[in-house]
Amino acid sequence: MEFNVIDERYIISADVGHGGYATVFLAFDQIRRKQVAIKVINCDINNDKKAYNMFQQEAMTMAAISNLNVVSIYGSGIYNNKPYLVMDYVRGKSLKDIIRENSYLLVDEVYTYMMQIINGLEACHNCNIVHRDIKPQNIIKKTDGNVVLIDFGTAYIGEVERNLYVEDGAIIIGTIQLLAPELLRGDEKASARSDIYALGITMYDMFTGKYPFDSTDKPTVAKMHLFSPFPSVRKLNPSVPVEFENIIYKCCQKDPSLRYQNVNELRVDLMIAYESYKNPKKMKKGFFSWLFKK
């Protein structure tokens, strides 16, 4: 660690996570008198304009959102030529870690998590923000039980250029196992519908402990998204209600026009599916046949 105090305000106490893009430190804010997370971008602003631009995008994106299920940002700055973000220190476990510990999650758990994730994602979309990297690793269950979305490093506000997965150039924005087909083809920009595709895959992972399309070879995963039939959730986990499987299928349609067009549509169907699961006698047979006819 190159510093112990940032801007004579934030006292660094621990390195709590690092990757190619950034390092996250636990710190104490001497003005607010509370623990915070400091995300220090691994670049020199004078030498890496691309990384600095990504940082500015993340800071602008996160500052635009105020929601219980989205991590809060308190400020940003530059110290020793390194940009940093000051955020809530989120105590808890990632959804990915929770899935690993349990192999798969139960219907009640999946429903509870999904409703909170949808709430946070709706706040993003209402601000014209697309997350672009929805996945279990970027969803944290706090010690108080609330779920929050984190890591807006690849998000954007409003109109941006189309983003491609390029096989020979290996250009990837997001995580390949959760990228919507239209992003892989490059024929549409990221949208609420591509976030919904990733959310459907996240839901699949919650129920099975696996991604539907996965391989150590990224071009193979891309081709699966584009051409392979979506695998059955119930084949891996027969306890999943068919109504929930149908919802996942609709989230993950290859044609974005056949998916839920916004997260509120998804929320409504989840509420109906959960009511059917908890009170099956109250629901008419065949009620969900309309899911793919909307």
Regions found by a protein language model. Give the residues of each.
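AlphaC helix of the eukaryotic protein kinase fold
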Residues: 42-64
